[in-house]
Swiss-Prot record:
Dephosphorylates 2-hydroxy-3-keto-5-methylthiopentenyl-1-phosphate (HK-MTPenyl-1-P) yielding 1,2-dihydroxy-3-keto-5-methylthiopentene (DHK-MTPene). Pfam families: HAD. It is an enzyme of class 3 (hydrolase). Keywords: Amino-acid biosynthesis, Hydrolase, Methionine biosynthesis. Its EC number is 3.1.3.87. Gene3D superfamilies: 3.90.1470.20, HAD superfamily/HAD-like. GO terms for cellular component: cytoplasm. This is 2-hydroxy-3-keto-5-methylthiopentenyl-1-phosphate phosphatase. It catalyses: 2-hydroxy-5-methylsulfanyl-3-oxopent-1-enyl phosphate + H2O = 1,2-dihydroxy-5-(methylsulfanyl)pent-1-en-3-one + phosphate. Belongs to the HAD-like hydrolase superfamily. MtnX family. GO terms for molecular function: 2-hydroxy-3-keto-5-methylthiopentenyl-1-phosphate phosphatase activity; 5'-nucleotidase activity. One of its GO terms (biological process) is L-methionine salvage from methylthioadenosine. Pathway: Amino-acid biosynthesis; L-methionine biosynthesis via salvage pathway; L-methionine from S-methyl-5-thio-alpha-D-ribose 1-phosphate: step 4/6.
Length: 219
C-alpha cells in the first residue's frame, strides 16, 4: 500500500478560483447564471464550464494570462508541503478542472508537468473552446468534465491510501472515494450534506501537520 495525494488547483493550491476570477473580469453578465447552475448542480460541470468559456473571446488570451500572473496567489505552505511529500515518498498529483493555459504556467518549477492533469483549451475560433481529455470512465456517468474519481482509479491501486484535497463541488466525487479528505469552503458543505468525513484546512501547513500525524500512525 502506498499513500496517494490528489490535489485540486483552483481555490485549493491557489487562494482564489481562477476560473471564477477570469469570469468576473472578462465574461459578460450572463456568466453569473451559468455559475450558479453549476453550483446548484442544475448543469453538469462539463456543460457549465464549456458554456462559461464560450462567453470569452479568444483574442483576450494574452490579457487573461497577464491578469492571472498578476493576481493568482499560491496558498501558504504549498511549497513546503511539496518538499514534505517528496521527502516521504508520497505520490502527489494535481487533478484540476482548470485549464492548461493557466495551470501549467502557474505551477511551472513547482510540480512536474507529468504530475498535472487538467483540461485543454482551443483558441483557434472566435470564442474559447474547452476540450476534455480526462472524461468519466464506466464507473461515473455525471459528466464531470475532468473526472477526478476516474483519474484516481486510473493512477492508483484499490489498496492504496487515497487522500483528496479540495474546495468545491468539483471535488465531491473524488472525496466520496477517498480514505481521507482535506476540505475547505464549499466542499465542506458538500461533505456534510453527503456524510463524508473530512478535515478542514486553510493552509498547507494545516495539511502537512495532519499528514505527518497520519504517517506516524501508519509507521
Amino acid at each position: 500500500m502506498s499513500i496517494q495525494v490528489f490535489c485540486d488547483f483552483d481555490g485549493t493550491i491557489t487562494n482564489n478560483d481562477n476560473i471564477m476570477s477570469i469570469m468576473e473580469k472578462f465574461a459578460p453578465p450572463e456568466a453569473e447564471e451559468v455559475k450558479n447552475k453549476i453550483l446548484s448542480q442544475e448543469l453538469s460541470i462539463q456543460e457549465g464550464v464549456s458554456q462559461l468559456f464560450q462567453l470569452i473571446p479568444t483574442n483576450l488570451h494574452d490579457d487573461i494570462i497577464q491578469f492571472l500572473i498578476e493576481t493568482a496567489e499560491i496558498r501558504s505552505g504549498f511549497h513546503e508541503f511539496i518538499q514534505f511529500v517528496k521527502e516521504n515518498n508520497i505520490s502527489f498529483y494535481v487533478i484540476s478542472g482548470g485549464m492548461d493555459f493557466f495551470v501549467y504556467p502557474l505551477l511551472q518549477g513547482i510540480i512536474p508537468k507529468e504530475q498535472i492533469y487538467c483540461n485543454e483549451t482551443d483558441f483557434s475560433a472566435e470564442f474559447i473552446t474547452v476540450k476534455w481529455p480526462h472524461s468519466c470512465d464506466d464507473h461515473c456517468q455525471i459528466h464531470c468534465g475532468l473526472c477526478k474519481s476516474s483519474l484516481i482509479r486510473k493512477l492508483s491501486d484499490t489498496d492504496d491510501f487515497h487522500i483528496v484535497i479540495g474546495d468545491s463541488i468539483t471535488d465531491l466525487q473524488a472525496a466520496k472515494q477517498a480514505d481521507k479528505v482535506f476540505a475547505r469552503d464549499f466542499l465542506i458543505t458538500k461533505c456534510e450534506e453527503n456524510h463524508i468525513a473530512y478535515t478542514p484546512f486553510e493552509t498547507f501547513q494545516d495539511v502537512q501537520a495532519e499528514l505527518k500525524l497520519l504517517l506516524e500512525v501508519k509507521a
